[in-house]
């Protein structure tokens, strides 16, 4: 019965995130908003059209902290439902945007929907994880957050059809009403178990540092800051592409792939979702840090080639690698959080860690928008993001290869991840005279 209830909560969390994932479809709205007024757009600059998305990301990240505390105290159902309703209201407010100012979109999509994203997202993952043993953290986290990643698969083409038939304003209103219904339905099924299932199988460690930690204890560890930086760098690179994918395809193809731009947004979303599930399962077997290092170096490599992409096939490869790598991080980091600092306070703890995603999410899209407005090219932004991911790879390696010194015993111990020592060097003790 417990497993059945746990899977219901997991699928409900995935469903809620499937609705909240409208954030990742913003590039379709942006493409229409920067279009000339004669073509049904607003004639906004890239920076104006990116601003609501950037504000939404910032609010998303900032709200994860109070939302995490609220869901730890009040339970996930109330928090998730409130988040869903705020997102719906925000979409309706955004429908009042016009050629004159992006303010309604900034207030509606940025502030209201961004707050809703944070509340809903903070409630879904911790609740699902608490229903399962530690060795399934990666799988369950991946499944729940996959809903957020795969959302553009249906939202992007749906939004494109709605924009073509009803225009920007009515599209926001239709999506807002639909969102209110679906988010309320899924939120009603999300709840915590009476007691988290923290019993691991023999040989499986419950947490790396032994027991549940508060956020204050968490931020006192050097490991937290290394992980925070890696999360920020991954978000910078991933959201830079996700938030501008339709525009990137249209621009770098010289307009040849303009009609297929929304398809690439959906393709990126498929790999985004796949990365969350596959990397979650993979990290359960080979370790979180190793998986993180692999996706960091993969994404860094592909971004070096992105400026040269102009054809259909090249953009497929680019969308696949970036989507998978970014999605992988969104399941690896919550799992690292639960492994290291426990599940009791995970809502608040992960909210604090999630500020890294917010910083990266604000920096990445706005950097790309500023650069393309100034130079007409994304190349410099790609190079910066690739360098950040290389730093993330190095940090992951430093986390994985640990060297411990015991001066009293004259020992040097080398460890790989959380495994037993692979080498131990003991200095010869001096014989007593």
Question: Where does each model-flagged region fall?
Answer:
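Central cavity-lining transmembrane alpha-helices of secondary-active solute carriers
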Residues: 51-69, 266-278
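C-terminal ends and interior cores of transmembrane alpha-helices
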Residues: 85-99, 298-310
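Helix-loop-helix hairpin linking two adjacent transmembrane segments in secondary transporters
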Residues: 144, 148-194
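C-terminal transmembrane helical hairpin of 12-TM major facilitator-type secondary transporters
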Residues: 237-240, 259-336
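Extracytoplasmic gate region of multi-pass secondary transporters
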Residues: 26-33, 216-279, 364
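Interfacial helix-cap and linker-helix signal at transmembrane-aqueous boundaries
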Residues: 33-34, 70-71, 154-166, 249-250, ...
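Hydrophobic core of transmembrane alpha-helices in multi-pass small-molecule transporters
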Residues: 102-119, 232, 314-328
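Intracellular juxtamembrane helix-capping segments at the cytosolic ends
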Residues: 33, 119-133, 140, 328-341
């Amino acid at each position: 019965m417990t497993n059945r209830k746990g899977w219901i909560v997991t699928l409900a969390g995935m469903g809620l995130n499937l609705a909240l994932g409208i954030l990742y479809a913003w590039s379709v709205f942006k493409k229409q908003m920067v279009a000339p007024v004669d073509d049904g757009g607003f004639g906004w600059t890239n920076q104006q059209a990116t601003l609501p998305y950037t504000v939404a990301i910032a609010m998303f990240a900032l709200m994860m902290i109070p939302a995490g505390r609220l869901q730890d105290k009040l339970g996930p159902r109330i928090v998730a439902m409130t988040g869903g309703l705020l997102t719906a209201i925000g979409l309706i407010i955004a429908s009042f945007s016009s050629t004159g100012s992006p303010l309604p979109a900034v207030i509606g999509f940025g502030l209201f929907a961004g707050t809703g994203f944070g509340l809903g997202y903070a409630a879904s993952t911790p609740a699902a994880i608490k229903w399962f043993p530690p060795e399934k953290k990666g799988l369950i986290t991946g499944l729940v957050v996959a809903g957020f990643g795969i959302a553009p698969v249906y939202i992007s083409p749906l939004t494109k059809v709605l924009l073509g038939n009803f225009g920007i304003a009515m599209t926001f209103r239709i999506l807002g009403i639909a969102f209110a219904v679906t988010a309320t339905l899924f939120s009603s099924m999300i709840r915590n178990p009476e007691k988290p299932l923290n019993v691991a199988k023999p040989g499986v460690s419950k947490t790396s540092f032994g027991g549940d930690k508060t956020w204050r204890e968490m931020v006192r560890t050097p490991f937290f800051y290394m992980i925070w930086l890696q999360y920020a760098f991954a978000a910078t690179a991933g959201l830079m592409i996700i938030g501008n994918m339709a525009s990137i395809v249209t621009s770098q193809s010289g307009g040849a792939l303009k009609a297929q731009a929304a398809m690439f947004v959906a393709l990126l979303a498929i790999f985004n979702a796949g990365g969350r599930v596959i990397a979650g399962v993979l990290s359960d077997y080979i370790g979180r840090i190793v998986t993180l290092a692999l996706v960091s170096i993969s994404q860094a490599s592909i971004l070096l080639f992105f400026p040269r992409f102009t054809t259909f096939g090249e953009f497929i490869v680019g969308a696949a690698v970036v989507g998978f790598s970014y999605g992988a991080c969104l399941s690896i980091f919550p799992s690292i959080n639960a492994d290291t600092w426990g599940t009791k306070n995970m809502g608040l703890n992960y909210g604090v860690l999630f500020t890294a995603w917010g910083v990266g999410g604000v920096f990445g899209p706005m950097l790309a928008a500023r650069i393309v407005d100034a130079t007409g090219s994304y190349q410099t932004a790609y190079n910066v993001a690739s360098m950040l991911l290389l730093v993330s790879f190095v940090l992951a390696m430093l986390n994985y290869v640990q060297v411990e010194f015991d001066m009293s015993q004259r020992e040097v111990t080398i460890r790989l991840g959380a495994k037993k020592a692979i080498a131990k060097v003991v200095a010869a003790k001096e014989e007593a005279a």
